[in-house]
């Protein structure tokens, strides 16, 4: 008798995606990140749903409603810190997932790659709006500074900022609309994830060698379901260690002070996962130039398939390209560190050098290294 998963239309869909999916036999732990991102997304939606039941999106009550969740709601503190630190885990997995795609040449699957970048932008927007909701000092001033960047748009900039704010400053209208978008965006992200997977399953997964996987494939279940469980345990172990031992490690102490439009915090900075982009923004003295550099720091990922000059897909056997890749990764970590430092010497200079190096590595060094390798292998 044919199993139900092969006959029922709905079960067939799940079966082709999670059970009988043909997968390359040699994919490493770096291919676990997709399932971990799915886990993070589900965790964020579930915890967010429970938080929304107790949260009040009103400027006069938002801060105290978060305090109420933490103190009075049954296990409210666990739900709150799972949601806050779950976002950090989400971004760690996202950055590693993108890094894996760059290293092993997965960006050559154009549709999957471009939807992935749209997913990154949607996730960043969701996280930014979520950071505003507790209505602490860093929430308020972070929202003021970042939304103010829209005023750099020529001619319509000021109108655009006031339209986003719903008034002449960040206030109740801003908080309400940010809560609305923060609630709806994860469901849009879920739809984009479905598209991401749809296009991925059209081509099949890449593998570390960067060669065709067609001659040697195995079913996703039980091999990769079992393998993914290890990654899942490591993710949950890290997350629960953060939540139960040091829940505020990645947060900002200023956010425990209620939002006050009359008092500016000494250092306004976003969450750690935006610091690299924030460092690039601050490195350009001109406002419009800074905003463009900020946008390009993410959108430059869309140009990578066009800049791919190598004759091999993966970087596994390309030592020069590996060198440029790890230079870029170290540069990204330096930018993250600089973004959290005050605007003073030597941090300004380091920020400007690393910002320029970020773009040079992607636009010049990586394609040049690939061309040199082609020449050395006599593949020109």
From Swiss-Prot:
Pfam families: Cytochrom_B_C, Cytochrome_B
Listed SUPFAM superfamilies: a domain/subunit of cytochrome bc1 complex (Ubiquinol-cytochrome c reductase), Transmembrane di-heme cytochromes
Binding, heme b b566: 97, 196
Cofactor(s) essential for the protein: heme b
KW Ion transport (keyword) present: no
Cellular localization per UniProt: Mitochondrion inner membrane
Record keywords, A-Z: Electron transport, Heme, Iron, Membrane, Metal-binding, Mitochondrion, Mitochondrion inner membrane, Respiratory chain, Transmembrane, Transmembrane helix, Transport, Ubiquinone
Residue stretches spanning the membrane: 33-53, 77-98, 113-133, 178-198, 226-246, 288-308, 320-340, 347-367
Recorded GO MF terms: metal ion binding; ubiquinol-cytochrome-c reductase activity
GO term, biological process aspect, one: mitochondrial electron transport, ubiquinol to cytochrome c
Coiled-coil ranges from the UniProt annotation: none
GO cellular component, one term: mitochondrial inner membrane
Binding site for a ubiquinone: 201
Positions contributing to heme b b562 binding: 83, 182
Membrane topology value: Multi-pass membrane protein
Cofactor remark: Binds 2 heme b groups non-covalently.
Similarity annotation: Belongs to the cytochrome b family.
Miscellaneous comment as given in the Swiss-Prot or TrEMBL entry: Heme 1 (or BL or b562) is low-potential and absorbs at about 562 nm, and heme 2 (or BH or b566) is high-potential and absorbs at about 566 nm.
Subunit structure: The cytochrome bc1 complex contains 11 subunits: 3 respiratory subunits (MT-CYB, CYC1 and UQCRFS1), 2 core proteins (UQCRC1 and UQCRC2) and 6 low-molecular weight proteins (UQCRH/QCR6, UQCRB/QCR7, UQCRQ/QCR8, UQCR10/QCR9, UQCR11/QCR10 and a cleavage product of UQCRFS1). This cytochrome bc1 complex then forms a dimer.
Function: Component of the ubiquinol-cytochrome c reductase complex (complex III or cytochrome b-c1 complex) that is part of the mitochondrial respiratory chain. The b-c1 complex mediates electron transfer from ubiquinol to cytochrome c. Contributes to the generation of a proton gradient across the mitochondrial membrane that is then used for ATP synthesis.
Protein name: Cytochrome b
